[in-house]
């Protein structure tokens, strides 16, 4: 039976019921709805709606229902209830009779669902942060094992300057750290309890909402009832954070796909995260990484959809807001799956020390070192930049690396170049000189790894 049937003289058409009902997806809020109902039952005691004995009967029945839900959440879908709130109430009435009908006193589904989705989001933030820390730890571990693996760094997908594989790993640690921080910021803003806001104007019962918030593990009660039932900022914030983090994961996946390609051959992905071709027996495809890359649009689409849902809504609650759930459920599930899969991809990765070094030696990635060398000899940087550019053109023409040119050849472009130039053109020198904080020098990378290990203990 619908919770709102008294006003109506005709039965709901089945076509509308199928269109309107949300149990098929909001069943995922069952635990939160039950926990919120237990909290509300305690609050009703303080305003003499329930006796202590009645509250205990309700709490026992709700706790029993919670155990049933946790053991088999899919069982909920066998019911014909309109939504999860209707389902919980009907099951409670089945267990305790008419006493169950008293629970909704002073409460609206508007503040009820606002509570449920906030509680669910808070729980998912904690789970996502745990998964992100696991990925960060795996990146740090991979970096630690590959500190001396030299590879080309790229701009415009052209070889630019030598870096290490460890430095590459630590770049993604930093990206994920910002994502983690954004989750923490969002958590703090969503940590306010809307229960007791009623439909929009607040509950008519003198409930201590701060005590209720504390009982439900919120930092405080919301300050405005109208805003409380209208607010879906926390969903949009999480979708925004998820979208940005998925973009980071997509960049990681793209790098791995390139590094794993036959053209680069820097890394080999495990058989456990790759697949083959139905036609070409030699193929080993990086499907895990490609799927991470491909799922970004799905998450960004959920963000865009939610923004469009709320952009024109008048205060307070509107049924449009039912559209918040499927998007956030799917987006955060997808995000967590991708974070976990990225961690799995790194578990058995093999890095080719020889191939990465060979690639780093090509492409004249030590050109900047030669320009800096000339600056140290008193040549203005703009002039040195031009001199090195001409030198590279010559080196390409004669099929030599800069380090292979003779002093006589160097002197065609600048007499400031002397025998000591060869010391600074080595890959190791290129790395060592980048010794400012955050740079690629082995010392700085080792410091970054050590610091990250302390943070992620």
From Swiss-Prot:
A GO MF label: argininosuccinate lyase activity
Enzyme Commission numbers on file: 4.3.2.1
Any one GO biological process: arginine biosynthetic process via ornithine
Entry keyword set: Amino-acid biosynthesis, Arginine biosynthesis, Cytoplasm, Lyase
UniProt-listed InterPro entries: Arg_succ_lyase_C (IPR029419), Argininosuccinate_lyase (IPR009049), Fumarase/histidase_N (IPR024083), Fumarate_lyase_CS (IPR020557), Fumarate_lyase_fam (IPR000362), Fumarate_lyase_N (IPR022761), L-Aspartase-like (IPR008948)
Cellular component GO terms held in the UniProt record: cytosol
Catalyzed reaction equations: 2-(N(omega)-L-arginino)succinate = fumarate + L-arginine
Recorded metabolic or biological pathway in which this protein acts: Amino-acid biosynthesis; L-arginine biosynthesis; L-arginine from L-ornithine and carbamoyl phosphate: step 3/3
CDD domains: Argininosuccinate_lyase
Keyword set includes Cytoplasm: yes
SUPFAM superfamilies in UniProt: L-aspartase-like (SSF48557)
Primary location recorded for the protein, binned into one broad class: cytoplasm
One family name in Pfam for this protein: ASL_C2
Protein location: Cytoplasm
Membership in a protein family: Belongs to the lyase 1 family. Argininosuccinate lyase subfamily.
HAMAP family in UniProt: Arg_succ_lyase (MF_00006)
Protein name from the UniProt record: Argininosuccinate lyase
Source lineage: Bacteria, Pseudomonadati, Pseudomonadota, Gammaproteobacteria, Pasteurellales
């Amino acid at each position: 039976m619908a919770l709102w049937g008294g006003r109506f003289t005709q039965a709901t058409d089945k076509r509308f019921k199928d269109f309107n009902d949300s149990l098929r997806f909001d069943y995922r809020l069952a635990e939160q709805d039950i926990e919120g109902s237990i909290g509300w039952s305690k609050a009703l005691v303080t305003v003499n709606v329930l006796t202590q004995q009645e509250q205990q009967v309700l709490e026992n029945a709700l706790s029993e229902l919670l155990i049933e839900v946790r053991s088999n959440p899919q069982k909920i879908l066998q019911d014909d209830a309109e939504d999860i709130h209707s389902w919980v109430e009907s099951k409670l009435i089945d267990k305790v009779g008419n006493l169950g009908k008293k629970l909704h006193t002073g409460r609206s589904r508007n503040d009820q669902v606002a509570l449920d989705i906030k509680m669910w989001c808070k729980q998912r933030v904690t789970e996502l942060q745990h998964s992100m820390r696991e990925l960060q730890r795996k990146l740090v571990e991979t970096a630690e094992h590959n500190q001396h693996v030299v590879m080309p760094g790229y701009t415009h997908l052209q070889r630019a300057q030598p870096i290490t594989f460890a430095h590459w790993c630590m770049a993604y640690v930093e990206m994920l750290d910002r994502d983690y921080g954004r989750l923490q910021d969002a958590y703090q803003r969503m940590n306010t309890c809307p229960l007791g806001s009623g439909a929009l104007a607040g509950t008519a019962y003198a409930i201590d909402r701060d005590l209720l918030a504390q009982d439900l593990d919120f930092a405080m009660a919301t300050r405005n009832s109208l805003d409380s039932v209208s607010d879906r900022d926390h969903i949009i914030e999480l979708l925004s954070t998820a979208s940005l983090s998925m973009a980071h994961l997509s960049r990681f996946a793209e790098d791995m796909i390139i590094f794993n390609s036959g053209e680069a051959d820097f890394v080999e992905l495990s058989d456990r995260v790759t697949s083959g071709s139905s036609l070409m027996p030699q193929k080993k495809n990086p499907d895990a990484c490609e799927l991470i890359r491909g799922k970004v649009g799905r998450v960004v689409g959920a963000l865009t959809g939610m923004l469009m849902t709320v952009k024109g809504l008048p205060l307070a609650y509107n049924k449009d807001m039912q559209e918040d759930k499927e998007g956030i459920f799917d987006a955060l599930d997808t995000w967590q799956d991708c974070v976990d899969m990225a961690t799995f991809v790194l578990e058995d990765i093999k890095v080719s020390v020889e191939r990465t070094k060979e690639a780093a030696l090509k492409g004249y990635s030590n050109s900047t070192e030669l320009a800096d060398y000339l600056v140290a000899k008193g040549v203005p940087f703009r002039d040195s930049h031009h001199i090195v550019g001409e030198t590279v053109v010559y080196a390409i023409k004669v099929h030599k690396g800069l380090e292979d040119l003779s002093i006589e050849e160097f002197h065609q472009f600048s007499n400031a170049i002397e025998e000591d130039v060869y010391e600074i053109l080595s890959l190791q020198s290129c790395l060592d000189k980048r010794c400012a904080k955050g740079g690629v020098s082995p010392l700085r990378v080792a410091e970054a790894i050590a610091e990250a290990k302390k943070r992620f203990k």
